[in-house]
Swiss-Prot record:
Pfam families: COX2_TM. This is Uncharacterized mitochondrial protein AtMg01280. GO terms for molecular function: cytochrome-c oxidase activity. It comes from Arabidopsis thaliana. Keywords: Membrane, Mitochondrion, Transmembrane, Transmembrane helix. Its main location: mitochondrion. A stretch of 270 kb of the mitochondrial genome is duplicated within the centromere of chromosome 2 resulting in the duplication of the gene. The expression of this duplicated gene (At2g07695) is not demonstrated. GO terms for cellular component: mitochondrial membrane. The lineage of its organism: Eukaryota, Viridiplantae, Streptophyta, Embryophyta, Tracheophyta. GO terms for biological process: electron transport chain.
Length: 291
């Protein structure tokens, strides 16, 4: 019984590979099903080519023997047979790749003429091809869950502190919009680009909030500074940060947005350190509120 089970029952009902198993497990995705179909199609034509070529070779070797066929025949040892056994596999190969050519033609036509509807012949040939099924299958995006979680937690800290740098949005709304954008991307490169942008943007907002908290502390310890301000110190602080960002953009023409964001982060860190170290004697206090 064990021997019979080992010989015949080698295909697992739960689609797990077994020793000496013949054939593939049932496909769980369209991509795997396409791979299995392609395997079967290719081997069908390979067997045809193998049988045809072997028959020609064996026949040629058999008739080449001087005792079997003393008078050479042109069909066996001539140009005709060489042409036939060369052209026949070529036609088979063309027949195999024809759906791929049709798919490439459809893609080129769609790129050159996006408003042109595909013809029925192109549609029927391309829809049945394995390449179309593979290309239409969406590739999963590998998510950086660690960085996403970090961004979410940092936004919650700013929300808990009622930071004015979250554009006045309700709690959870800012992260919800970012998360929706991240989940709607269709390419891995676009996901990384968007995630890096959101991380840099949040770093800038965190730096601005930290500078504002230090600035408020300086004002609380030195009430006379508010009297020197031409208008609201907080509004003056916001205007000062915007002006410095504009100055960075003007002084660094041709720089990428990522590089400009890094320069702004460094500048905000410099402001925070100077306010902490020098307090009301800080150079930036004088620029904000006047001498």
């Amino acid at each position: 019984m064990i021997v019979l089970k080992w010989l015949f029952l080698t295909i697992s009902p739960c689609d797990a590979a077994e020793p000496w198993q013949l054939g593939s497990q049932d496909a769980a995705t369209p991509i795997m099903q396409g791979i299995i179909d392609l395997h079967h199609d290719i081997f069908f034509f390979l067997i045809l080519i193998l049988v045809f070529v072997l028959w020609i070779l064996v026949r040629a070797l058999w008739h080449f023997h001087y005792k079997k066929n003393a008078i050479p025949q042109r069909i066996v040892h001539g140009t005709t047979i060489e042409i036939l056994r060369t052209i026949f596999p070529c036609f088979i190969s063309i027949f195999i790749v024809e759906p791929s050519f049709a798919l490439a033609l459809d893609d080129a036509a769609e790129a050159l003429f996006p408003n042109t509807a595909p013809t029925p012949s192109n549609t029927s040939s391309s829809e049945d091809s394995f390449g179309l099924r593979v290309l239409s299958e969406p590739w999963p995006i590998t998510r950086n869950l660690g960085l996403e979680s970090s961004i979410c937690n940092r936004i919650r800290l700013l929300e808990a502190a009622n930071s004015p740098f979250l554009l006045g949005k309700e709690k959870g709304q800012y992260w919800g919009e970012i998360q929706e954008c991240l989940y709607n991307v269709s390419e891995q490169r676009e996901y990384y680009r968007l995630l890096d942008f959101e991380n840099r943007d949040l770093q800038i907002r965190e730096r601005k909030h930290s500078c504002l908290e230090v600035f408020r502390g300086v004002l609380l310890r030195n009430p006379y500074l508010e009297e020197r301000a031409a208008y609201s110190p907080q509004e003056a602080f916001f205007d000062f940060l915007n002006e410095r960002r504009d100055a960075l953009d003007i002084s660094n023409p041709g720089s990428s947005p990522a590089e400009m964001d890094r320069l702004e982060i460094l500048f905000l860190g410099e402001i925070e350190r100077d306010l902490l170290r020098r307090g009301d004697e800080s150079l930036y206090i004088k620029q904000l509120l006047g001498d």
